[in-house]
Amino acid sequence: MEKPKPVTQAGKAIALAAVVLLVCVPFLVIVSTSLASTDEVVAGGGWVLWPTEPTLKAYRDILDGGIVTHALGVSAGVTVVGTLLSLACTVTLAYALSRPGVLGGRPVLLLVLFTFLFPPGMIPSFLLVKELGLLDSYASLVLPVLVNVFNLVVLRGFFQGIPDELYEAARLDGAGDWRVLVSIVLPLSKAALAVVGLFYAVAYWNSWFYASLYLESDHWPLQQVLRTYVVAGSGLTDATTGEGTITAPQTVQMAVLVIATVPILLVYPFLQRYFTKGVLTGAVKS
């Protein structure tokens, strides 16, 4: 294999450094602005690259029992409960559709794929949620999107890749479908489950559209509150007292951005080893 030329390596390094700066500098500006004083941000034209006197005042203001604290709890609860329920439903349905000879398996698969190709519109979805009595309830953020077809197809394909000999050996030992799923399929699918679980968690955490449709403002999750702070900052309820309206300073807006971004970023390091294992498993053939 020919060794890359120094010029080529230098070009790749410069391009990679440019991409890193393009990604990291905006986030650094957001964090720095959230830690700066209001006067320093105003003097800097609305943003600060590095605060001279860092302060946590913006974080104290929005986390002192106000709407952001409540919204953070809502988002965390919806993300945890929604991810667990979605994984449970997706795993069971994917396992059933991955096994040959399941009664009605192909029609169900075609029906699921049909919903992927032709998703329901906003008005039919709203009317369905209304008829089910789910308006202004947290269930409206989970039940309408409980199973994602893409994640279902990913898990189904992974389950189909498990050698049939393992299924046959379990059957000979007298294991039923649930025992096979719990004792054989799930332990072998940790990498796929981690990826799909992360997809679900990110989707639930970042969801704001359904909240704007189905929930009143006192039940909003964090992303909807974030949108209100950043896009319509002049019409906010006071984050500390819960009364009146204020114009959110730039420091408060950036602090809300950090609070909305950091929790989901912290999940990646814990799942990194499963991603690596999944890549190696797909690259090595027995």
Describe each region flagged by the PLM:
Residues 1-286:
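A hydrophobic, multi-pass inner-membrane permease signature
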